[in-house]
Amino acid sequence: MSQQIDPQQIDPELKSGQIKVLLEQYKILKNEIHLTSQKMTGNIRIGLIVLSLIGSYILHSLIKNEITKSVIDNTTDAVMYTISILLIIGLWTNVFSSLSAIARLGGYLIYLEKTINELIGKNLMIYESEFVPKFFTGSAILAYDLPNVLVFGCTSLFVISFLGYKVLVTINTPDFNLILRSFIILILVISTILFLVNLFTILRVNKVKDEIVTFCTKKIK
């Protein structure tokens, strides 16, 4: 904990300059958090699209032996493989892009921490133990949300696909409309999961941003 200094003894010009530096770095940090959260939610969407395709392809593969085979089976296989490969490439490209964004965010966090530490003990009476953990908590949230979401999405899709297959086998009616309805239900379930995951992620990121705004507003006045 740094020694507190009487505000009356602070050089106003020096204080103004230091606050300006802090605010400029805060603006950069806030922008990076926004961009990173956008990238992460984009990856969540792409990841769930890939997983939905994989899930629907597994479902298709499991039930196609019970349906009259035709040329459309081979065409469907080719389309599914092509789209899946393209989306997987897109997913991993965005994952590495997000990791790069998180690395930049970490760099700004360290730089801002250094700036704040220079202010500690000089004039603003900011304490490292009170300030820094909030930023690194936000960084950790952004870094760990995507893997958790993908694991959750993969597990959910496996269960949904398995249950869908069991329902089709139980009904035992090789009806294309039934398969189509099952696929639509699968997409609706995935869309619901996607909505809830994105909402949860956005709320968490916004909560961290609100904490940062509140803290900075109180400390630099």
UniProtKB/Swiss-Prot annotation:
Major place of residence: membrane
Cellular localisation: Cell membrane
Ranges that cross the membrane: 41-63, 78-100, 141-163, 178-200
Gene Ontology cellular-component terms listed: plasma membrane
Keywords: Cell membrane, Membrane, Transmembrane, Transmembrane helix
Domain of life: Archaea
Membrane topology: Multi-pass membrane protein
UniProt-recorded name of the protein: Uncharacterized protein AF_2214
